Amino acid sequence: MVQAWYMDESTADPRKPHRAQPDRPVSLEQLRTLGVLYWKLDADKYENDPELEKIRKMRNYSWMDIITICKDTLPNYEEKIKMFFEEHLHLDEEIRYILEGSGYFDVRDKEDKWIRISMEKGDMITLPAGIYHRFTLDEKNYVKAMRLFVGEPVWTPYNRPADHFDARVQYMSFLEGTA
């Protein structure tokens, strides 16, 4: 099962867990109030998984590809890692399914505090359009993930501040409704 927690304020190596002290775990229900959705799937059978197909159909995830993030295979690795870790939002949902390896998604809560979500093999997450977030590998420095999209893939990050976008305005309205 996925683990999530409030982060400390350290700016040291982002690949470390950065748990706040004392530990402040975050439940799946708390993540749902932020619009974050989570599924646990069998990554060994992702090519023929009826559960994944059901989710894709239900949420209209019609396009997918697979990305491997590691120093040996990803062109412009250092540049990409920095870009992924820059706080940003998207105008569409961000959907990732971890097939191998691990990493962290960090999302902002309603008080603008960072929550770290530890993602491992079999974890699938949907971040809502308009949520500020970032991604980093953990200390294993490797992840293979399926990227899913509704329609044609659009992966345009808008770095913070990006509060003027409709997706952000709608997301903030959603948060007010979950208070």
Swiss-Prot record:
Membrane topology, from the record: Peripheral membrane protein
Region entry Disordered, spans: 1-24
Q: Name one GO cellular component term.
A: plasma membrane
Q: Which domain of life is it from?
A: Eukaryota
The cofactor note from the UniProt entry for this protein is: Binds either 1 Fe or Ni cation per monomer. Iron-binding promotes an acireductone dioxygenase reaction producing 2-keto-4-methylthiobutyrate, while nickel-binding promotes an acireductone dioxygenase reaction producing 3-(methylsulfanyl)propanoate.
Q: Which InterPro entries match?
A: ARD (IPR004313), ARD_euk (IPR027496), RmlC-like_jellyroll (IPR014710), RmlC_Cupin_sf (IPR011051)
Q: Where in the cell is it found?
A: Cytoplasm; Nucleus; Cell membrane
Please classify the protein's predominant subcellular localization into one broad category. cytoplasm
What Enzyme Commission number(s) apply to this enzyme? Answer: 1.13.11.54, 1.13.11.53
Annotated pathway: Amino-acid biosynthesis; L-methionine biosynthesis via salvage pathway; L-methionine from S-methyl-5-thio-alpha-D-ribose 1-phosphate: step 5/6
Q: Tell me the keywords, alphabetical order.
A: Amino-acid biosynthesis, Cell membrane, Cytoplasm, Dioxygenase, Iron, Membrane, Metal-binding, Methionine biosynthesis, Nickel, Nucleus, Oxidoreductase
Q: Which cofactor does it need?
A: Fe(2+); Ni(2+)
| UniProt-listed Pfam families | ARD
Molecular function terms, GO-annotated: acireductone dioxygenase (Ni2+-requiring) activity; acireductone dioxygenase [iron(II)-requiring] activity; iron ion binding; nickel cation binding; oxidoreductase activity
Q: Which residues bind Ni(2+)?
A: 88, 90, 94, 133
Q: Where does Fe(2+) bind?
A: 88, 90, 94, 133
The cross-references to SUPFAM superfamilies, in alphabetical order and at most eight, read: RmlC-like cupins (SSF51182)
State the reactions this protein catalyses: 1,2-dihydroxy-5-(methylsulfanyl)pent-1-en-3-one + O2 = 4-methylsulfanyl-2-oxobutanoate + formate + 2 H(+); 1,2-dihydroxy-5-(methylsulfanyl)pent-1-en-3-one + O2 = 3-(methylsulfanyl)propanoate + CO + formate + 2 H(+)
| One annotated GO biological process | L-methionine salvage from methylthioadenosine
Function statement: Catalyzes 2 different reactions between oxygen and the acireductone 1,2-dihydroxy-3-keto-5-methylthiopentene (DHK-MTPene) depending upon the metal bound in the active site. Fe-containing acireductone dioxygenase (Fe-ARD) produces formate and 2-keto-4-methylthiobutyrate (KMTB), the alpha-ketoacid precursor of methionine in the methionine recycle pathway. Ni-containing acireductone dioxygenase (Ni-ARD) produces methylthiopropionate, carbon monoxide and formate, and does not lie on the methionine recycle pathway. Also down-regulates cell migration mediated by MMP14.
Whom does it interact with, and what assembly results? Monomer. Interacts with MMP14.
Q: Which family does it belong to?
A: Belongs to the acireductone dioxygenase (ARD) family.
Q: What is this protein called?
A: Acireductone dioxygenase
